[in-house]
Regions:
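Active-site-proximal loop/helix segments of hydrolase catalytic cores
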Residues: 1-50, 59-76, 149-214
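Active-site HxH/HxHxD metal-binding segment of metal-dependent hydrolases
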Residues: 57, 65-113
């Protein structure tokens, strides 16, 4: 019908960080405290015409601030129809040097979703679900077909070294073309190789290469 619709996969670092006053959120070494892209992200979305009426989904790939730090602001300002956010707790990471402000950004996004009217939180993806609202990882988005991948939840009972090992990815397909948004999926446990094999991604038209080089 010619109306714009939008979806987002991550949204970048923000200026917010824990000050250490809350014992749940220590000010750990490695937490980003001097960089944020709130203004740039919001300005770009506004320039595209994103509003609270046309943002259909926000995929929070994993709880690292350089990916979802601005997520709570996005939710509060643009109230996406659905937010995809896998469960997180610091106990899911066995390498304490990689906890950073993971729980802080996760809890902030979760709170924003809970406090924003009309936003559906999806924390568990199920290929047998009847609709996107019920947790299907595959859904139509305008002329696109979206597939959310790497949503297995083994990390809930078998802790990982880093949240990158339970990081969502997104495949977008339209008009016989495909794009793969990798986020921070790596191959430490074979995730990248498995996804390429399972989804036939040996030949694609566009890939956002993550900063881990896999």
């Amino acid at each position: 019908n010619g109306q714009k619709i939008f979806g987002m996969v991550d949204s970048g670092e923000d200026w917010d960080y824990p000050d250490g006053s809350d014992p749940r959120y220590p000010l750990r070494s490695g937490i980003t405290t001097s960089t944020g892209y709130d203004d740039e992200v919001l300005s770009y979305l506004d320039s595209l015409g994103v509003t609270s009426d046309n943002l259909q989904f926000y995929v929070a790939t994993h709880p690292h601030s350089d990916h979802i730090g601005t997520g709570d602001t996005i939710v509060r300002l643009y109230s996406p129809d659905r937010v995809y956010l896998l469960p997180y707790d610091d106990s899911y990471i066995y390498n304490t040097a990689r906890l950073w402000d993971n729980l802080y950004v996760y809890d902030q996004l979760l709170t924003a979703v809970e406090e924003t009217e009309g936003v559906t939180l999806i924390q568990h993806l199920n290929p047998g679900a009847a609709s996107a609202e019920e947790g299907s990882p595959d859904f139509a988005f305008g002329n696109f077909q979206i597939q959310i991948v790497n949503y297995e939840e083994d990390y809930l009972t078998s802790p990982k070294e880093d949240a990158n090992q339970f990081c969502l990815g997104v495949i977008a397909s339209a008009n016989d073309h495909r794009a793969f948004l990798t986020s921070d999926i790596d191959d430490v446990e074979g995730d990248a190789s498995r996804i390429v094999s399972n989804y036939g991604l040996y030949s694609i038209d566009l890939m956002t290469s993550n900063h881990h080089g896999y």
